[in-house]
């Protein structure tokens, strides 16, 4: 019995030892479960933080998209305002050109009036020149009269000498007459020397008493008759000399009527010697000295007028030549400026085309980055959904396991407990690795999104810089247009109407080219806005998609590589 008692005690002791071991292992398992639960809660907290960070990244992406849309809208508004301002400037320039055209038309009318006045002045000058031809004829007449007067002097000088000789003979005859009168046999009709003048006019009656004297008186009577003949010839020559000299004719005709003057002139002309009568040539006439002096004064005045008119004509011709030279120089300068402006416009067009190409390339890059972002968002959504799907099954078996753990008893053996611990550790390690992998992926996505955001900001800055450059180019173009406008105003004032349509057509062509460039820039901006709107619509559709099939169908649609795709869709 004593031996049996120790054996039983040993058996009881052996039975008690596994129970004690089980009782000792239960606190360890509880501690391990609590640690695993803490690790799971920590992992859940990290997952919640990662999800919250992903939501914040989505919010940041939405904010960036909204800011991008606002920036695009602001750029569009600014471009529209600039286009409106350019259109207003073009309208103002067109109205100013029309006003300049009307002013040039008025100036042309004024120039036509001035030309008509100048033509009238030239007609008057031609009339004066035509009046100058009679002046030449008067000068010729004066020269002819001078020559005739010289010839008359050549004729009159010997006649004057002969008259002097005849006067001497007349004095001798008067002395002889006085001697005869002193004699008692004198003739009663010869009492005065004043009767010699009627003898000179009618010499035949007085010759009868002279014949009587020649018959009765001898040599004295013959001498007296000879002297009477000489006196008759002298009286006739004296009358002829009175008619020939312009100074003695007015004195002898004072106090006579016009008929008596005409009769006296005819008588004196009849008594002239034929060689002494001056007959003017045909087409010429004799004029008095006063009229001759008046004609000379008029000729000198006309000569002065002719000289002044010729000087004015020379000055006008010189001014016209200078104005033509100035106009030619100004035209050359204007052509050079127009060529420079065209070259500047071509360079500006090249820069604008290059800027448009750069903008198109940047738009293509933005489209590609947008597609990449769409793919990344799609992948993130898929991973998020996968993580959620993994989390739900992992959380779902925990409840039954806890209930089963509560309901069922702990493992009865140490190997089972060790296997359970290894299994739980492996599960916890796998969950930790999955969470770390997800967190790493989220970090990578955050970095990529930040890089994409930085690229978008850089693209926006480059677009703003290009817009600033285009503004500067438009300002330079406006300045060149203003300078061209001023030059055109200055040149249009100096040119005639036939050159105005060409310049106007050139300016209109330039305006049309500028309008076409503005329309192309507006079209590019509208296409950019449409493309961004279409991309935003697709992104919103991807966000609102509930299944992966819808996302795949949206992403499998035609890529937005051209604006025509937007118009077709």
Swiss-Prot record:
InterPro entries associated with the record: Rabaptin, Rabaptin_coiled-coil, Rabaptin_Rab5-bd_dom
Keywords: Acetylation, Cell projection, Cilium biogenesis/degradation, Coiled coil, Cytoplasm, Cytoskeleton, Endocytosis, Endosome, Phosphoprotein, Protein transport, Transport
Chain spans, region Disordered: 1-38, 181-267, 388-414
Modified residues (N-acetylalanine): 2
Pfam families linked to this entry: Rab5-bind (PF09311), Rabaptin (PF03528)
Phosphoserine PTM sites in chain numbering: 189, 193, 200, 204
Family recorded in the similarity comment: Belongs to the rabaptin family.
Subunit structure: Heterodimer with RABGEF1. The dimer binds RAB5A that has been activated by GTP-binding. Interacts with SDCCAG8; this interaction is important for ciliogenesis regulation. Interacts with RAB4; this interaction may mediate VEGFR2 cell surface expression.
Function text: Plays a role in membrane trafficking and in homotypic early endosome fusion. Participates in arteriogenesis by regulating vascular endothelial growth factor receptor 2/VEGFR2 cell surface expression and endosomal trafficking. By interacting with SDCCAG8, localizes to centrosomes and plays a critical role in ciliogenesis.
Protein name (database record): Rab GTPase-binding effector protein 2
